[in-house]
Amino acid sequence: MEKMRIVLTGGAGFLGSHLTDFLLKKGHSVTVIDNFITGRRENIEPFSNDAAFTFIRQDVTKHINIEGGVDFVLHFASPASPIDYLKFPIQTLKVGALGTLNTLGLAKAKHARFLLASTSEVYGDPEVHPQNEDYWGHVNPIGPRGVYDEAKRFAEALTMAYHKFHNIDTRIVRIFNTFGPHMRKDDGRVIPTFIGQCLNDEPITIFGTGEQTRSFCFVSDLVRGIYRLMLSNYCNPVNIGNPEEISIKTLAELIGRTANKKMRIVHKELPEDDPQCRKPDITTAKNVLSWSPKIVFRDGLDMTVRWFMDHSL
């Protein structure tokens, strides 16, 4: 397979850094653009001595200038956890709008392919279960989650507009809940939050009854699916996630057992617009990409808990 020069925005984040590692190991050259608003320098430090890796510190809402040819532009930059996009609501909207416009403009100027990292949040609090790519969603545009949900929905619309009117070769991946090593303990996502509370002998905080469900995909499976989408010719959105569903209450119990810790659970009021269920229909990924997750959830959880135990909290 031909070696590509890839520009990856948000490459210092959790997903972006795993994808950078994967692409470098495949023999591609990767230029990461990140402003560290939520990404971390330590996530990309392991690549600093790799001749195929380049880093540019920049806000992608500003014009992006890259010297030389580019084969693929991957737009992963965005605050993605509730804590982050509630803290940076304007930046979240700007990176979804201006950041997507600038990265699409780069792809257009370089005659490069383009992939947008979208999200299951475009489905909002779904009234259809599981969610397939034809479902338009159930989103409150002015609710607290709206800044992220609508930023990604706009980014998808802009991507398809560039595909149709500028003939840009585009891809859209709708990423469902993903977990694994290198997650920030303070990013507000449920798995690192529960692990941190458990390892610190703090009570585990469950919002609502804990009967609400999520589906969690291990990060190596996600990256593998994204790469298959990159190499495909499919331009419509594709769900990538693990359809294995688990309640938040069961998740807390599993983390306690995995960490060999006694747990105390504290219930708090459910946040506004928090979805009751989230589960991907991955029929398209199976049929178009021949992709399905390989890592069993409990195995991935064990690897993640052990990583957190090996790194200071």
Describe each model-derived feature in a short phrase.
Residues 154, 158, 162, 194, ...:
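Hydrophobic alpha-helix immediately C-terminal to the catalytic Tyr-X-X-X-Lys motif of short-chain
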Residues 49, 143, 183-187, 244, ...:
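Residue-level signature of the cytosolic catalytic core of signaling kinases
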Residues 15, 190, 247:
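Conserved alpha-helical elements of sugar-nucleotide-dependent glycosyltransferases
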Residues 37, 42, 191-192, 223, ...:
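Short alpha-helix within the catalytic core of nucleotide-sugar-dependent glycosyltransferases
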Residues 6, 19, 58, 102, ...:
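C-terminal substrate-binding subdomain of Rossmann-fold SDR/epimerase-dehydratase oxidoreductases
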Residues 1-178, 220, 295, 303, ...:
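N-terminal Rossmann-like NAD(P)+-binding domain of SDR-like oxidoreductases, especially those catalyzing
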Residues 129, 185-193:
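A glycine/serine/threonine-rich, flexible loop-to-helix segment
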Residues 39-41, 124-125, 182, 248, ...:
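A short beta-to-alpha transition loop/helix N-cap that caps and shapes the active-site region
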